[in-house]
């Protein structure tokens, strides 16, 4: 080792490593554990050196979901920094959502210093350093991560970062977790001791296509099918898949149902779009394709046909993070759905005869008629505007849809009003819808900000219930929106409670004591004014309870957002 070589802290090399793995942003909720990194960032800034830009988030839920939104928009995973065990705990719900959605994000947290009497730079120097050391910090998020690691020495800082990035970006993708004690970050190393790990030699593993025999087997089944059905939830994470799936469905006459969609998987105006509930089609299908879907239907409500032949095409067909998963699959195939569907379409085109094309065209025509009937039904539902103090959410969502462009992005976290959003606000372009993969409510606020950060030219609309609005840490999201000039429209469909809780109780105990007493433990305060919360953060706020006021209120909110200011439309809708 050359004694004249420059020496730098682990934190310095850590920032270099973050650059090398290609992070654009670090979404941060800093604490005492990050002092060496903050010092290194200041040094980089003074020297004019490149490093990821930092976005400060008052709550970790905002930070993690914001990173996820940016990742969805760009296809490049990002980094999040939080404070020791407490920040990790605040991040756990968001990590759950990212795990289920297979979104690659690197969550980084410090650990309490391990020296107590000044033995090393970075030693414990405040009360919290003694109380923020659990026996197993990573256990908080272990169920939701693909990989975890504690950095033992700065000499492998870049190696650890490359490993984290490789794991999170390898299919099936997902979040990873890295921790580091403060003394490790302050330790110094010469430049010659630190090695880089370039992506071209240490990069991620991507899902591939299928062998010709598997493609041929699926094609054979489809060529003979009379009532083919395809169910998907997240094939549209790759925008190119949407057009391929549409062409395949039209060519082969396949009904496509999106059950709990995370993205636009098929344009909602496609003649083959079969809506969002597969129940009727399940009973009739003779050939079924599950394509990138975790929960294709609810077996207790929608029994499948035991005679249906199923093929499951998925980046994760074994559902390795689901302790119990028993949906049928005569053929289970892991791979990239875009490549597989494109190969399947080519195989069908090569083998289809005139009779097949005639039958497929007839199915497409019949599906188109069914689609028109669904749209007519949705339009009829929207004609009921509601009454004073209880706006019909169908009417509100239909009115909002008319004010949006096809390229605008909708985040659907309306939960029990989610089907209303789906029915009244069809999205026809890839990348214009984001739904909830996990069970952690409150994802859409942070994700909306991340999407807006990545695509500032787009209008981003977050639709939530009042219960979900609380979960989304709105003070934090409104603060980030204001500080970083990321205007988003939030629509709160306020039914004064948790409809999901009430409905779940009635499903299990339809004639029980809760129903008799009318108490479901689900009623929230009806007197909140979320518009005032928005105004306190410098955003535009509207509280609307009269149907006649809806259209003008939406227009004012969109004018504010398109003028650079976030808006919250608090709408009093049909109560529980």
Question: What is the predicted role of each segment?
Answer:
Residues 11-21, 29-41, 368-457:
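Active-site diphosphate/adenylate-binding microenvironment
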Residues 179-183, 233-234, 413-417, 571-574:
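Short, well-ordered beta-to-alpha junction loops that form the rim of enzyme active sites
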Residues 2-351, 406, 478, 487-490, ...:
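N-terminal alpha/beta PP-like core and its mobile active-site loop of ThDP/TPP-dependent enzymes
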Residues 45, 71, 168, 249, ...:
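N-terminal cationic-hydrophobic initiation segments that often serve targeting/anchoring roles
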């Amino acid at each position: 080792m050359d004694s004249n070589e420059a020496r730098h802290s682990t934190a310095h090399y850590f920032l270099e490593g973050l650059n090398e793995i290609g992070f654009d942003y670090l979404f941060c909720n800093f604490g005492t554990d990050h002092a060496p990194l903050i010092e290194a960032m200041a040094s980089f800034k003074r020297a004019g050196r490149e490093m990821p830009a930092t976005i400060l988030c008052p709550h970790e839920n905002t930070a993690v979901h914001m990173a996820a939104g940016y990742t969805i928009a760009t296809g490049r995973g990002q980094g999040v920094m939080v404070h020791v065990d407490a920040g990790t705990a605040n991040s756990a719900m968001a990590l759950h959502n990212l795990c289920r959605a297979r979104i690659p994000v690197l969550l980084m947290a410090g650990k309490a210093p391990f020296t107590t009497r000044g033995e090393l730079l970075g030693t414990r120097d405040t009360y919290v350093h003694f109380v923020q050391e659990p026996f197993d910090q990573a256990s908080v998020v272990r169920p939701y991560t693909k990989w975890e690691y504690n950095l033992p020495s700065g000499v492998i800082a870049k190696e650890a970062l490359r490993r984290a990035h490789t794991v999170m970006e390898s299919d099936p993708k997902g979040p990873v977790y890295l921790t580091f004690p403060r003394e490790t970050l302050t330790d110094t190393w010469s430049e010659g001791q630190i090695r880089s790990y370039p992506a071209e030699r240490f990069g991620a593993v991507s899902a591939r296509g299928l062998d010709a025999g598997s493609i041929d087997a699926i094609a054979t089944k489809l060529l003979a099918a009379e009532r083919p059905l395809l169910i998907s939830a997240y094939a549209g994470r790759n925008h190119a898949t949407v057009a391929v799936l549409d062409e395949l469905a039209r060519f082969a006459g396949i009904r496509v149902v999106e059950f709990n969609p995370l993205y636009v998987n098929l344009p909602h105006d496609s003649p083959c779009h079969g809506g969002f509930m597969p129940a009727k089609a399940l009973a009739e299908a003779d050939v079924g394709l599950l394509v990138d879907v975790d929960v294709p239907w609810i077996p207790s409500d929608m029994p499948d046909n035991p005679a249906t032949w199923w093929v499951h095409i998925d980046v994760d067909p074994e559902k390795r993070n689901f302790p119990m998963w028993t949906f049928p699959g005569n053929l289970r195939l892991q791979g990239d759905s875009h490549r597989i569907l494109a190969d399947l379409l080519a195989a069908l085109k090569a083998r289809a005869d005139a009779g097949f094309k005639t039958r497929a065209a007839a199915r497409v025509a019949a599906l188109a008629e069914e689609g028109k009937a669904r749209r007519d039904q949705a339009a009829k539902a929207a004609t009921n505007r509601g009454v004073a103090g209880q706006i019909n959410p169908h009417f509100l969502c239909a009115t909002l849809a008319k004010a949006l462009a096809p390229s605008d992005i909708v985040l659907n976290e309306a939960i029990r009003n989610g089907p209303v959003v789906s029915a009244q606000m069809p999205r026809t372009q890839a990348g214009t819808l984001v739904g909830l993969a996990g069970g952690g409510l409150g994802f859409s606020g942070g994700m909306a900000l991340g999407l807006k950060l990545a695509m500032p030219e787009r209008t981003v609309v977050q639709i939530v219930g009042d219960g979900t609005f609380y979960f989304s840490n709105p003070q934090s999201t409104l603060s980030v929106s204001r500080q970083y000039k990321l205007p988003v429209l939030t629509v709160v469909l306020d039914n004064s409670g948790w409809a999901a809780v009430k409905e779940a109780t009635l499903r299990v105990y339809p004639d029980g004591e809760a129903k008799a007493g009318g108490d479901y433990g689900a009623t929230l305060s009806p007197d909140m004014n979320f518009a005032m919360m928005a105004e306190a953060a410098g955003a535009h706020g509207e509280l609307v309870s009269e149907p006649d006021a809806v259209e003008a209120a939406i227009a004012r909110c969109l004018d504010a957002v398109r003028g650079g200011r976030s808006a919250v439309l608090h709408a009093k809708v049909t109560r529980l």
